[in-house]
């Protein structure tokens, strides 16, 4: 069961990272194509990145309060429709630039909590076995590093073939896939509650 959970977590983090890296290329290209303005493209990039600087530290407290698994689930579940809404609203003629900025800002706000949950969920899942922790950590780091390299390259291949809007739909699907993997195969952890009880009895 634990091996299945770790494998699902590694797969979820790889898929989610792949989607994030594809978005970093597909979203600016989408803005440039739809607005024809490099300035607006730069502004969208700034709005997407800004939450990383502002919410980095508070995200750690959020993970401690909600738990890493819950934070990861909420982050992926929120990012999927937020990202899919961008090309969908554009296709229906309802995407103003102000609304685009709002969606991108919200999308960016869920990035820091997800990254913070990545750092804490593995120890919760694996436990205190240093050998297993090292093996699992190597799998996660290697997989996400590979996804970080493949994501932009894959986006560069898919954008000319599918178009930037459809690539954004693909990116949204990766977040949904990550959500389903964690929801169905990564169990809730009770270690924090148990440790809190041990401290109280001591």
Give short role names for the model-derived ranges:
Residues 1-202:
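Alpha-helical transmembrane-bundle signature of multi-pass membrane transport and export proteins
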């Amino acid at each position: 069961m634990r091996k299945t959970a770790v494998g699902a977590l590694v797969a979820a983090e790889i898929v989610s990272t792949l989607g994030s890296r594809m978005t970093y290329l597909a979203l600016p290209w989408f803005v440039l194509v739809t607005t024809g303005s490099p300035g607006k493209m730069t502004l969208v990039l700034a709005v997407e990145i800004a939450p990383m600087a502002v919410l980095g530290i508070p995200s750690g407290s959020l993970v401690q309060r909600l738990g890493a698994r819950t934070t990861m689930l909420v982050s992926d579940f929120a990012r999927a429709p937020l990202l899919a809404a961008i090309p969908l609203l554009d296709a229906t003629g309802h995407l103003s630039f102000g609304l685009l900025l709002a969606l991108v800002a919200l999308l960016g706000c869920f990035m820091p909590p997800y990254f913070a949950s990545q750092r804490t969920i593995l120890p919760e899942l694996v436990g205190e076995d240093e050998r297993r922790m090292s093996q699992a950590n190597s799998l996660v780091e290697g997989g996400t590093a590979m996804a970080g390299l493949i994501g932009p390259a894959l986006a560069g291949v898919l954008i000319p073939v599918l178009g930037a809007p459809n690539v954004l739909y693909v990116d949204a699907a990766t977040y949904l896939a990550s959500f389903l993997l964690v929801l169905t195969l990564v169990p809730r952890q009770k270690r924090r509650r148990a440790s809190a009880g041990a401290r109280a009895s001591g």
